[in-house]
A protein has these predicted regions:
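All-alpha RGS (Regulator of G-protein Signaling) helical domain and cognate RGS-like helical scaffolds
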Residues: 2-166
Length: 166
C-alpha cells in the first residue's frame, strides 16, 4: 500500500500549480492525505510487525495474509505498477492525465481496502479500510465532476462503482 500511495504523491506533484477547476488544490489535499497515511502505515509496521521487512513486499500467490513468511520482495516492475509510473504527462495533457490516473489509483485503493476487509481481523486495519472506501468514493465522484467540466465522461470512469459500498 505504501508503494501505491507513493504513486499518488508523484502524480499529484505534476498538477500542484493548476487552478482550473480546483485541480491543484485537490492534488495538494490528496498529497497531504497520502503522506499522512504512509507515515501511519510505517508506524503500524514498526509497532505491530517489527520483524517485517522494510523493503517493499507483497503477499505470495496463495500466501497466508497473517504470516510474514508469506511475503516476498516486490519486483521493480511490481513497484512501478503500484506507483503507476507507466507514463509521464505533457504540459497539455497533465490535467486529464492526473484526473483519469487518480480514478484508476483510487480504484486500486478500493480493491485493496475490500481485500483488507475480507482478510483482516485487526480493528485498526478494518477501520482504515472503511475510511479509505468512503474517502476514495468521495474523491472519485469529485474527479469525475472535474472531468465532466472539461467535457469528458467515459464509461471507464465508472468501473469501480460496485466497490463504493462495504
Amino acid at each position: 500500500m505504501v508503494q501505491h500511495h507513493t504513486g499518488a504523491l508523484r502524480m499529484s506533484e505534476f498538477v500542484f500549480d493548476i487552478g482550473q477547476p480546483g485541480v491543484g488544490a485537490l492534488a495538494k489535499q490528496i498529497w497531504r492525505d497520502q503522506a499522512q497515511e504512509i507515515k501511519a502505515m510505517g508506524q503500524w509496521r514498526k509497532s505491530w510487525y517489527p520483524e517485517a521487512p522494510v523493503y517493499p513486499a507483497a503477499l505470495k500467490t496463495g500466501g497466508d495474509p497473517n504470516s510474514i513468511e508469506s511475503l516476498e520482495r516486490m519486483s521493480a516492475a511490481h513497484i512501478q505498477a503500484m506507483q503507476m509510473m507507466g507514463s509521464t504527462p505533457t504540459r497539455d495533457n497533465r490535467v486529464t492525465w492526473f484526473l483519469e490516473g487518480m480514478i484508476a489509483h483510487h480504484g486500486g485503493a478500493l480493491v485493496m481496502a475490500h481485500d483488507a476487509l475480507n482478510k483482516s481481523t485487526n480493528p485498526t486495519i478494518r477501520r482504515l479500510a472503511r475510511d479509505i472506501i468512503v474517502a476514495q468514493r468521495r474523491e472519485i465522484i469529485e474527479l469525475r465532476r472535474m472531468l465532466r467540466h472539461d467535457g469528458l465522461n467515459k464509461p471507464e470512469y465508472h468501473q469501480f462503482d460496485a466497490l463504493f459500498s462495504f
